[in-house]
Amino acid sequence: MHPHSPAATGLTRRGVLVGTAALAGAAATATAPAAEAAPGHPARATVFRNVRPYGAKRPTDLVAVDGLLTSGPAPHGAEVVDGGGRIALPTLVDAHIHPDKTAWGEPWVSRNPAGSIAEYAEEDVKLYHALRTPLKERAERLMGHAVTRGTRAMRAHADVAPAFDLAGVEGVGSARRNLRHALDVEIVGFPQHGVIRTPGTRELLEEAARTGAVDRVGGIDPIGFDEALDEQLDVVFGIADRHGVGVDIHLHERAATGLESLRAIIARTRALSLQGKVTVSHVFCVPGLPGRELDQLAAELADAGISLTTVAPSSDLVLPLDRLRAHGVEVGLGSDGVRDSWSPFGNADMLHRAHLLAWVGDARLDEELEAAFRAGADGGARLLGLPETDLKPGCPADFLLVRGECLPQILVDLPQRDLVVRAGRVVARDGELTGR
């Protein structure tokens, strides 16, 4: 081990996020109920025969008509797909991912040592210039891969900084348009380099929101990184208020520092009546709070309509989902970075991320494993304002088919997603995207 490597010095990617902390739509973002067939036009219908919803012992048929599941008979001439006794499960939602940064599908990238958020951000810039594949192609490649693994929607954070201009949001926007048949995407303009500490960033965030390139504007560690709590929140919430976009702020700050920032975010949300439009991601100051303090904070978050996201990084940093949900706080699960300058890990597979959530939570019981899956399927859906896909009549015909015994076993074994269905149409088969 090199004496100055992150491991030798105790500075890891996770450690940097935690240690530094110690020192805030496009039409494609919402899944509207499928419209009824226009007069004179036949309904678009598919029957998925011989499937087992949630691992039911007796196979049944799922009938999709114009994008919705129905209890009625399929119209004459409906397409038939044989499920072969596979288990049908709802597709999932990635509530926090960075597709603009990815080197997914590129030649292997050797990462350089980094010891702070600022240094990791510098590595982002180096990788951006080193990769030969255009950002929009890399983002689309990763987002398409996510579809093949059963993701139906995602909230994509794209860096906004003078080093990139708006290339990130434009590239992810291009991928969103090309994958709109298979994937809902919400885009966040993310100021990875800081809102205040990097001149020119606030103007780019304003432009991205004004032109409709983003659905949300982001922020990052207002105290620990930007060192300007009020000024950063003035900018972020001001842009959101002026342009009618949401907010999603990265908050890695811990303990009292994180709580100070979080309570300031709560106050801004209430003051501008942005309830239901604000998310705080990671929120490392919440895990480990004493029970009474956690309950009080959860009640404040719920009253302000603020949602949270976690990427299940470790047992000590994952959010206490059950306790938060009991107070009415919505919590989404996400992939975070995937094969980028920050980490060689990640795969944009939300079933795997739900598996990791169960693992860091020491899940043993079937109901605990099922709850981890529901966090990936339902938590993000509620965050993005999407209808849940519980395989019942009237729900979106969005589901995946896998071989297995039951849901808990599938979460543990992570079998191949044999078929991915979006609005009643097969969009991926055997790990590959199908035609549009």
Task: Show where each model-derived region lies.
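His/Asp/Glu-enriched, well-ordered alpha-helical/loop segment
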Residues: R268-V278, D322-G404
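Active-site gating loops and adjacent loop-to-helix segments of metal-dependent hydrolytic enzymes
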Residues: T102-L135, S261-T279, L297-E300, N347-R364
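N-terminal metal-binding scaffold of metallo-dependent hydrolase/deaminase domains
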Residues: H2-G77, L407
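Alpha-helical scaffold segments that flank or form the walls of functional sites
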Residues: G105-H157, A163-N178, L204-R210
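Active-site core of metal-dependent hydrolases
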Residues: A182, V188-P199, T211-L319, E330, ...
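Divalent metal-coordination and catalytic microenvironments
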Residues: V51, G67, G85, H96, ...
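C-terminal cap of metal-dependent C-N hydrolases
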Residues: P393-R436
